[in-house]
């Protein structure tokens, strides 16, 4: 079974890769897409975490980045429900996932 710590570390690895993608795009299109996705999700099933993301996504990129990479429990919780799906390719996601498979027992 995979530990919560490993799940949190894997989530941080995904977030780090997402940040790298977003920073490579000066227009930050992925942030705009995440805002739209978050709005759709809020209409379907509002939650405190989506409300937090909705608020956060209206802030400057550096604040969003800081939250994505935040090592606190708040950061872990936000990463578990982040609206940046689709930023990483399937290959990138699997590479990260496989890197953490050795931590499963």
Locations of the language-model features?
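A general structural signal for well-ordered secondary-structure junctions
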Residues: 28, 47, 62-63, 74-75, ...
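Mid-chain, well-packed structural core segment of small domains
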Residues: 53, 59-67
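Non-transmembrane "mature" sequence context
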Residues: 42-43, 61, 98
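Short, compact, well-ordered microdomains
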Residues: 66-105
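The feature represents the first ordered module of a protein
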Residues: 3-56
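Alpha-helix initiation and N-capping motif
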Residues: 31, 35, 49-50, 61, ...
């Amino acid at each position: 079974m995979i530990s919560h710590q490993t799940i949190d570390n894997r989530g941080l690895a995904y977030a780090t890769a997402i940040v790298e993608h977003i920073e490579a795009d000066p227009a930050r299109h992925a942030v705009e897409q995440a805002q739209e996705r978050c709005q759709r999700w809020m209409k379907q099933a509002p939650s405190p975490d989506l409300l937090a993301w909705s608020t956060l996504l209206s802030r400057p990129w550096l604040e969003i980045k800081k939250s994505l990479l935040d090592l606190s429990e708040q950061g872990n919780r936000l990463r578990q429900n982040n609206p940046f799906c689709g930023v990483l390719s399937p290959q990138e996601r699997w590479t990260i996932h496989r890197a953490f498979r050795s931590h499963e027992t």
